[in-house]
């Protein structure tokens, strides 16, 4: 048997961290011996645990320690981080460390350095005395890359000290929840976050246009509750189609009936915007008179439209190189405190992979599996609201305005 001592510190009981640690050891056929366990006596007091973890051999023990490391386990002996040079551009040394989306620190030069721009499934490099989390495609030959878990500390999220909608939801997904109560709680979170100067990003799919939630999202942008819009070609095209023709995918938004020749409207829309020189120019020329993109431009709210192989056109502002789009999205998400994902599974998962675990994340979709897939792919902090986005957004805006009136 091989053994290694590890320790945990934080809200180990109410955040279920210690329970998860024991489950990991047992699920991987390991053994443990608890040496010390100090329980915090008050709500804000951290707990501390120290134990010996046993594995059959070095490889088995290393497997267990890797999983424990992801939830905050650390080696009591302070060790310097291990580094190895990248042998070529986009090529990593053996045993390179793969990040989680939790706040991470590395021990370098006798100091704990915070890892900047943390997100999941990336690597850590040391450059000019600072630690950076970067994707594989940004690694260059000679970069000093972190290998192994020595000298790396992960701080997993803990249960909030006060009751919030995120504690109320508990990260679970169910359609059997009081939807209006949840939306009211989310509205309160949004209102209080903006009072503190926080920033909110919205990830939206074209269903926002098709379900007539467009006006509510445009109003949220106009009233200053949205600081960043992340979407694709379709949302912008159909939003502008509504502004020009009053249809979305050829359906009359007011009457709910197809319009003769309406199936061509989105193509006419794209052509008009391209001819005008882009969305901003089309607004300046009076072609686009209202809607989501109109409010973004008029209120200087940045937007990033990422392209896909399904796109018609696309619009001039759409970034067709997905790697460039991902990089721009990552840069734009710096400083964002909350992300609201609206009826777009693939875009939601893509953005979720770029977020640190401390960013509040709300995913709204009719399909419960969308939220489940988002969390299964690592965005465990997300809460799910299983409802029609066409009902959610107007009610959310109404609740925010009610809170404004009371304050």
UniProtKB/Swiss-Prot annotation:
It is an enzyme of class 4 (lyase). CDD domains: SDH_N_domain. It catalyses: L-ornithine = L-proline + NH4(+). NAD(+) binds at residues 233-234, 312, 344-347, 365, 388-389. Keywords: Lyase, NAD, Nucleotide-binding. InterPro entries: ArgZ/ArgE-like (IPR005239), ArgZ/ArgE-like_C_1st (IPR048964), ArgZ/ArgE-like_C_2nd (IPR048963), LOR/SDH_bifunc_enz_cons_dom (IPR007545). Its cofactor is NAD(+). Its EC number is 4.3.1.12. The keyword Transcription does not apply. Transmembrane segments: none annotated. Belongs to the AgrE/ArgZ ornithine cyclodeaminase family. NCBIfam families: TIGR00300 family protein. Catalyzes the conversion of ornithine to proline, with the release of ammonia. This is Ornithine cyclodeaminase. The lineage of its organism: Archaea, Methanobacteriati, Methanobacteriota, Archaeoglobi, Archaeoglobales.
């Amino acid at each position: 048997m091989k053994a290694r001592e590890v320790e945990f510190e934080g809200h180990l009981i109410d955040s279920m961290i210690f329970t998860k640690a024991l489950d990991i050891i047992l699920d991987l056929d390991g053994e443990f011996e608890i040496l010390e366990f100090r329980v915090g006596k008050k709500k804000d007091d951290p707990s501390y645990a120290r134990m010996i973890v046993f594995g059959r051999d070095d490889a088995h023990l290393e497997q267990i320690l890797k999983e424990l490391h992801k939830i905050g386990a650390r080696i009591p002996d302070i060790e310097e981080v291990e580094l190895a040079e990248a042998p070529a551009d986009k090529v990593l040394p053996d045993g390179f460390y793969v990040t989680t989306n939790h706040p991470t620190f590395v021990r370098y030069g006798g100091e704990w350095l915070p890892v900047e721009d943390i997100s999941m499934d990336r690597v850590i490099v040391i450059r000019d005395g600072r630690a950076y989390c970067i994707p594989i495609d940004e690694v260059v030959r000679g970069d000093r890359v972190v290998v192994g878990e020595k000298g790396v500390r992960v701080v997993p999220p803990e249960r909030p000290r006060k009751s919030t909608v995120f504690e109320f939801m508990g990260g679970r997904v169910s359609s059997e929840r009081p939807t209006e109560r949840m939306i009211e709680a989310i509205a309160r979170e949004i209102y209080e976050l903006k009072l503190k100067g926080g920033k909110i990003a919205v990830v939206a799919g074209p269903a926002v246009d098709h379900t007539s939630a467009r006006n509510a999202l445009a109003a949220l942008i106009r009233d200053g509750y949205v600081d960043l819009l992340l979407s694709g070609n379709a949302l912008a095209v159909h939003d502008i189609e509504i502004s020009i023709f009053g249809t979305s995918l050829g359906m009359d938004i007011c009457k709910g009936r197809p319009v003769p020749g309406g199936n061509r409207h989105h193509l006419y829309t794209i052509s008009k915007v391209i001819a005008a020189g882009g969305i901003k120019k089309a607004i300046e020329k009076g072609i686009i008179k209202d809607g989501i993109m109109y409010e973004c431009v008029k209120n200087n709210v940045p937007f990033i439209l990422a392209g896909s192989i399904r796109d018609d056109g696309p619009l001039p502002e759409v970034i067709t190189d997905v790697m460039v789009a991902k990089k721009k999205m990552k840069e734009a998400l710096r400083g964002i405190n909350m992300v609201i994902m609206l009826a777009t599974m693939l875009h939601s998962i893509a953005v979720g992979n770029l977020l640190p675990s401390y960013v509040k994340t709300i995913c709204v979709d009719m399909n419960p599996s969308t939220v489940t897939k988002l969390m299964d792919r690592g965005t465990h902090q997300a809460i799910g609201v299983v409802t029609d986005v066409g009902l959610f957004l107007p009610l959310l805006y109404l609740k925010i305005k009610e809170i404004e009136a009371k304050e």
